[in-house]
Amino acid sequence: MILMPMASVVAVAEPKWVSVWGRFLWMALLSMALGSLLALLLPLGVVEEHCLAVLRGFHLLRSKLDRAQPVVPKCTSLCTELSVSSRDAGLLTVKTTASPAGKLEAKAALNQALEMKRQGKRGKAHKLFLHALKMDPGFVDALNEFGIFSEEDKDIIQADYLYTRALTISPFHEKALVNRDRTLPLVEEIDQRYFSVIDSKVKKVMSIPKGSSALRRVMEETYYHHIYHTVAIEGNTLTLSEIRHILETRYAVPGKSLEEQNEVIGMHAAMKYINTTLVSRIGSVTMDDMLEIHRRVLGYVDPVEAGRFRRTQVLVGHHIPPHPRDVEKQMQEFTQWLNSEDAMNLHPVEFAALAHYKLVYIHPFIDGNGRTSRLLMNLILMQAGYPPITIRKEQRSEYYHVLEVANEGDVRPFIRFIAKCTEVTLDTLLLATTEYSVALPEAQPNHSGFKETLPVRP
């Protein structure tokens, strides 16, 4: 959508300048301008209260201006707030075009944030930085200044993300370039240290005796939990106990969608195929392997489309995947990368995360792309000696957020998200196999009728 200058928007919205609405609008504009000027003349102790009044005034003005704007459809699940750190999770947005009023409000908020920062009122400044970026997510100066603010708070990863986002929008922004050059090596060191922590926990898991009954119990429970969460992320409403019932008895759950139950059976078939065929196989991962995984994932729901590339264009949130005629070529290139020396030299968690992202970016299938991508990710982890990980349904928003950020040009938050999931899985295994073990929810320690577990390789 092409945005007109504010004066143009106002003129189109109300050509009768003598109307009550027109007079009110210009009075509001004038009051905002005078109010901002007054802020410079007021004693410093009054600025904090004034900035809040200014923001309230902008909210009123924005509500009037928005009446002149075209109605924009609400974003899909992928167009949501972005989690960049635990402190500011869900407070920054991506892929949103600011209105003229929003940009004006963002500039006012940034100026007030810098003033609050100068006064040492960092809590107020923090909220104003976030407000500025909420109003205008592409405000490069606000991204850069918030990055500096985050650095001062020792949040190097968030600062580096903000500089990177600023440079994605404006590649030659001098201040962001200088700041990013400073934070990039620090962030790389932090990421490598985190990988080392994960590696040390993998070694502890590998030291658990192969015959450990506690390990077997938790892996069986993890199997059910993985199926439950991976289909729940896609909207499946079956409960964990219902999924256990389906897989253990092979009987349908009365009153529940047969399609949802077939999704569970398909996931079970795909995981069984991976466990018995691919995990221990020596050699490269082929395109046929991925097609076979997908054939099982979707085979009980849509056997016609299972195991074949899509033939229609799809839209995933803001992301437009490759045209159907380009899918096979991109999958060939993806397969070459999967088996390349560059990929093999990556840390296993980074390799698995990138493989997941690349496959879901291509979106080669009409349905089942997310489930297939997560299975491929776990295949790579297991081949490297790691346990399979679970992305829980409660993490759905964060999961989609970091995928959206990757689509915007920074895949590192997604890699860190997968690393976090890996660490949680390792901690669960270590906790469950200690003397004071804690079972997973709805676990049944004495259950032994289910044999197809996802193995932890010795």
From Swiss-Prot:
It catalyses: L-tyrosyl-[protein] + ATP = O-(5'-adenylyl)-L-tyrosyl-[protein] + diphosphate; 3-O-(5'-adenylyl)-L-threonyl-[protein] + H2O = L-threonyl-[protein] + AMP + H(+); L-threonyl-[protein] + ATP = 3-O-(5'-adenylyl)-L-threonyl-[protein] + diphosphate. The active site is at residue 363. Residues 45-458 are lumenal. One of its GO terms (biological process) is protein adenylylation. The side chain of Glu-234 determines which of the two opposing activities (AMPylase or de-AMPylase) will take place. In response to endoplasmic reticulum stress, mediates de-AMPylase activity. Adenylyltransferase activity is inhibited by the inhibitory helix present at the N-terminus: Glu-234 binds ATP and competes with ATP-binding at Arg-374, thereby preventing adenylyltransferase activity. In unstressed cells, disengagement of Glu-234 promotes adenylyltransferase activity. SUPFAM superfamilies: Fic-like, TPR-like. Residues 285-420 form the Fido domain. The chain crosses the membrane at residues 24-44. The keyword Transmembrane helix applies. Keywords: ATP-binding, Endoplasmic reticulum, Glycoprotein, Hydrolase, Magnesium, Manganese, Membrane, Nucleotide-binding, Nucleotidyltransferase, Phosphoprotein, Repeat, Signal-anchor, TPR repeat, Transferase, Transmembrane, Transmembrane helix, Unfolded protein response. One of its GO terms (cellular component) is endoplasmic reticulum membrane. The fido domain mediates the adenylyltransferase activity. Homodimer. Interacts with HD. This is Protein adenylyltransferase FICD. It comes from Mus musculus (Mouse). The lineage of its organism: Eukaryota, Metazoa, Chordata, Craniata, Vertebrata. The gene is Ficd.
